Amino acid sequence: MNEIDEKNQAPVQQECLKEMIQNGHARRMGSVEDLYVALNRQNLYRNFCTYGELSDYCTRDQLTLALREICLKNPTLLHIVLPTRWPNHENYYRSSEYYSRPHPVHDYISVLQELKLSGVVLNEQPEYSAVMKQILEEFKNSKGSYTAKIFKLTTTLTIPYFGPTGPSWRLICLPEEHTEKWKKFIFVSNHCMSDGRSSIHFFHDLRDELNNIKTPPKKLDYIFKYEEDYQLLRKLPEPIEKVIDFRPPYLFIPKSLLSGFIYNHLRFSSKGVCMRMDDVEKTDDVVTEIINISPTEFQAIKANIKSNIQGKCTITPFLHVCWFVSLHKWGKFFKPLNFEWLTDIFIPADCRSQLPDDDEMRQMYRYGANVGFIDFTPWISEFDMNDNKENFWPLIEHYHEVISEALRNKKHLHGLGFNIQGFVQKYVNIDKVMCDRAIGKRRGGTLLSNVGLFNQLEEPDAKYSICDLAFGQFQGSWHQAFSLGVCSTNVKGMNIVVASTKNVVGSQESLEELCSIYKALLLGP
């Protein structure tokens, strides 16, 4: 479908889609973007979320104005997907008709025609009222703290990727003594044109825009209205594959096929099974925990790494090795049968570092699904430190070199790059392949998402600053048994948000036991 088919587009967009295309506010999805939308089309993934705490409260009018300024500068935050076969798209995307052929021409995306604060703030949306009641009740019972139970409740939220009244993300406002003023929020995204780093950028932009408001703002009925604001709105950025070369080397395919064959036959699998998100709630239960490492403890960890490893070493390999060693110590996960010798670690990696050195272009891609990944399959036995404690620091140094080399060689681009190659898009139905690779497969390894350390500088004249950040996600249909979301600040330290399922760990109490072992090892390896 190369021509605009207005008959099949969402009705909310029919009148102005052509105008939006001409203005740079609508276009075909890129192939990288389509991969993340496919997870939603097939109900294989729900959301990631980031908790952010500011130093002071903002009013409803301040929040509306701040969001308006952020969205005008970053139109990606206003986008929705225009599905084929509206409004029967959900059934169509999971039909034999859709699966029967490839779809190299992707659906359109466009900005919303209008957006009110009620279209963003999840508290005010009746379809989420039952979950919101539980979230606010838990927040009150925890005396204003972000807890593992709140995170677990957010994993049940489905954010529509097709609008029509809201974007592909939402904001939960957590009230304390003031019901109409907030300083604690949760950014929830379905991963369409958004990633963990996008959510961190959101809170930094929110802080900056609130600081830019010097006088009480007037009441705004809309965050954005296309017919009035289109001239103020920046153009949507081009698909990221047009500015970054994702193409893998020629040997990538045979190497991947060989390593995949070996891994599939030798990997350890748990009792947990991947399934569509609706089925998870029927047959399994998500379990969650949050580990906080205080700023003092965090500095001690960094000092410990520095004293034991020559040269520069990031914290990610330390987190990775400590996690697998903890699984060994725990003794309730790695129980391999014959020939189950391998596990895997899947580490998302930001692609923005590969953008051209141009400030304007880098600003354009602050928001988006601009993340690749590196993954490798270590031997389970190498993390057994009962009789080999002297191998602990050399193992961390080894994986630091492995990760660093992968990033230097741009391997984090290659997995996505293979899936967006022209011949793959032309001959393969990506949605069907995703389902075939996931549904019914047993969970095994770990997803480790470290979105980074974000130091907050003291600015005497600034009313608003960031006090805390915590990133987490349930891995959905990805085959990993565990998800670890890591985010750090110099104010509240490092937060590690852990998710798994009862079929993997047994119970919530078992996960808490595992996380206690992990925290103890992080603090005193």
Curated annotation (Swiss-Prot):
Entry's free-text remark on domains: Segments of the N- and C-terminal domains (residues 24-41 and 508-525, respectively) are predicted to be amphipathic helices and are essential for endoplasmic reticulum and lipid dropplet association.
Bilayer topology annotation: Peripheral membrane protein
pH dependence as annotated: Optimum pH is 8.
Expression induction or repression: Expression is repressed both by aeration and by unsaturated fatty acids. Also repressed by heat and ethanol stress. Rapid induction by glucose depends on the cAMP/PKA signaling pathway. Long-term expression requires both carbon and nitrogen sources. The activation of transcription is dependent on RAP1, and the ROX1-TUP1p-SSN6 hypoxic repressor complex is responsible for repression by oxygen. The putative ROX1-binding sequence in the ATF1 promoter is 5'-CCTATTGTTTT-3' and the RAP1-binding sequence is 5'-AACCCAACAAA-3'.
Highest taxon of source: Eukaryota
TM stretches of this protein: none
Protein's cellular compartments: Lipid droplet; Endoplasmic reticulum membrane
Thermal dependence of catalysis: Optimum temperature is 25 degrees Celsius.
Summary of the knockout phenotype: Reduces levels of isoamyl acetate production during fermentation to about 16% of those produced by the wild-type strain and causes a 40% reduction of ethyl acetate formation.
Annotated organism of origin: Saccharomyces cerevisiae (strain ATCC 204508 / S288c)
Any single biological process term in GO: acetate ester metabolic process involved in fermentation
UniProt note on regulation of activity: Found to be inhibited by cadmium, copper, zinc and mercurium divalent cations and sulfhydryl reagents. Inhibited by the addition of unsaturated fatty acids to the culture.
GO CC, any one term: endoplasmic reticulum membrane
Recorded name of the encoding gene: ATF1
Record field: catalytic activity: an aliphatic alcohol + acetyl-CoA = an acetyl ester + CoA; a fatty acyl-CoA + H2O = a fatty acid + CoA + H(+); 3-methylbutanol + acetyl-CoA = 3-methylbutyl acetate + CoA
Record-annotated active site: H191, D195
EC numbers, comma separated: 2.3.1.84, 3.1.2.20
Miscellaneous comment text of the record: Present with 1990 molecules/cell in log phase SD medium.
Family: Belongs to the ATF1 alcohol acetyltransferase family.
Protein name, UniProt field: Alcohol O-acetyltransferase 1
UniProt keyword Protein biosynthesis, yes or no: no
